[in-house]
């Protein structure tokens, strides 16, 4: 069964805790720290690692999802899931507000960051983001109804190493904004390679 991490708030912790946040009815709301972001080096020439990230640590393979509702205001305001090994290796994926438009956005960082976007035609009230870690990759999906999920990115992430899993929000240019994360779930998946071994070595 999927674990509802909110029932065990002590299992999650902050990296760059924001000044204002609260957990209520299994949802977490925060006022995002102004002028904060996650990015390394490429294109812009700077490295920042100072935005709020609320996480628990998992080894092995898993599926994680969360519903995100944000009051995006300024260019680059963003909120999403984050999978982080360390300051040089992480993935963040969610919504990013750029040039007045909502973008399904993914940043994959291994020493340097990249950025991919899918621009949406209209503003949306919320989005679901799901990530599946299997072997040495993470598949990232989005949904507007938590029923039909569409792949938005498949990215490499080192296998067999613990990863911090949770949600982040950043406000690189603005004065902060409100965001709410709901229905956060992490589901353990049996190790793929072990399942294959079991098939060949069944009793």
Language model segments and positions:
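Low-complexity, Ser/Thr/Pro/Gly-rich disordered linker/stalk regions
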Residues: 7-60, 189-203
């Amino acid at each position: 069964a999927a674990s509802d991490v909110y029932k065990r708030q002590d299992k999650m912790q902050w990296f760059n805790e924001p000044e204002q946040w609260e957990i209520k009815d299994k949802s977490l709301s925060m006022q995002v720290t102004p002028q904060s972001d996650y990015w390394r080096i490429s294109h812009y020439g700077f490295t920042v690692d100072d935005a709020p990230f609320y996480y628990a640590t998992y080894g092995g393979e898993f599926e994680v999802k969360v519903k995100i509702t944000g009051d995006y205001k300024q260019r680059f305001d963003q909120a999403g899931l984050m999978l982080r090994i360390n300051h040089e290796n992480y993935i963040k994926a969610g919504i990013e507000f750029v040039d007045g438009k909502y973008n399904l956005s993914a940043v994959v960082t291994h020493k340097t960051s990249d950025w991919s976007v899918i621009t949406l035609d209209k503003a949306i009230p919320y989005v679901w983001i799901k990530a599946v870690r299997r072997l040495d990759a993470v598949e990232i999906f989005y949904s507007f109804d938590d029923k039909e999920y569409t792949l938005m990115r498949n990215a490499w992430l080192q296998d067999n190493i613990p990863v911090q899993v949770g949600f982040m929000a950043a406000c690189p240019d603005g004065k902060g904004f409100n965001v709410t994360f709901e229905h956060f779930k992490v589901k353990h998946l049996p190790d793929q390679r072990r399942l294959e071994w079991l098939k060949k070595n069944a009793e």
